[in-house]
A protein has these predicted regions:
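Hydrophobic adenine-recognition pocket in adenosine-nucleotide-binding enzymes
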Residues: 151
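Glycine-rich phosphate-binding loop signature in dinucleotide/nucleotide-binding domains
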Residues: 62-63, 138-142
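Short, well-ordered alpha-helix to beta-strand connector turns
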Residues: 142-143, 170-171
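Class I SAM-dependent methyltransferase SAM/SAH-binding core
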Residues: 66-137
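A conserved beta-strand element that flanks and buttresses the S-adenosyl-L-methionine
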Residues: 146-147
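Class I SAM-dependent methyltransferase Rossmann-like catalytic core
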Residues: 1-70, 75-77
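Conserved class I S-adenosyl-L-methionine
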Residues: 173-175
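A short, conserved alpha-helix within the catalytic core of class I
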Residues: 155-170
Length: 175
């Protein structure tokens, strides 16, 4: 059964182009991060990032046992909000925090450093991480959940299939 009657779109961002200057790519990432935190009164039930927290709570029953690896994290996306909101809830329940790790093929280290200084449960991988071949990063005592926040438009069908295959083979869950 096909749910959609149109073909999958492979969209590009200006920042993805080889001719795009790094400063513009970083600015583009910052704007996209702000969109995750945008709340439209009367139209939405909180920001998209806060709404995503509900998905975590429903599908990952023991959040404290996870390390969440944000693939294609850009300038941080929803991860700072996810960390803050989810860990407030865990703390109120007397549970330990869930850890978050930012990664990207083009790491935005300056922004990630700023985030991790404010939020002790957010760390980052300074070297490039190719979403098509991600090794396991979680400690052996932790489960690993990979999150893919509006990033699949960067990939063709073959790469997208490889990314999901990698997540199935080397992580415990993905969203």
């Amino acid at each position: 059964m096909q749910l959609f009657s149109w073909p999958r779109s492979h969209l590009l961002e200006i920042g993805d182009q080889t001719w795009c200057p790094a400063w513009l790519h970083q600015h583009e990432q910052l704007v996209l991060t702000q969109l995750w935190n945008l709340r439209t009164p009367g139209w939405s039930h909180g920001s998209l990032a806060k709404q995503a927290c509900a998905v975590f709570k429903v599908h990952l029953k023991d959040l404290s046992s996870y390390t969440v690896l944000d693939i294609c994290a850009g300038a941080g996306g929803p991860t700072p909000v996810l960390e803050s909101e989810l860990n407030k809830g865990l703390e109120s329940e007397g549970k330990g925090p869930v850890q978050f790790v930012l990664s990207d093929l083009y790491p935005h280290v300056e922004e990630w450093e700023r985030i991790s200084k404010k939020q002790q449960n957010v760390t980052y991988i300074e070297s490039p991480v190719d979403a098509r071949a991600v090794p396991r990063f979680a400690a052996s005592s932790k489960k690993e959940c990979r999150i893919f926040n509006i990033c699949f438009h960067h990939f063709g069908d073959e790469d997208a299939a490889g990314i999901l295959k990698s997540a199935v083979e080397t992580a415990d869950s993905f969203m």
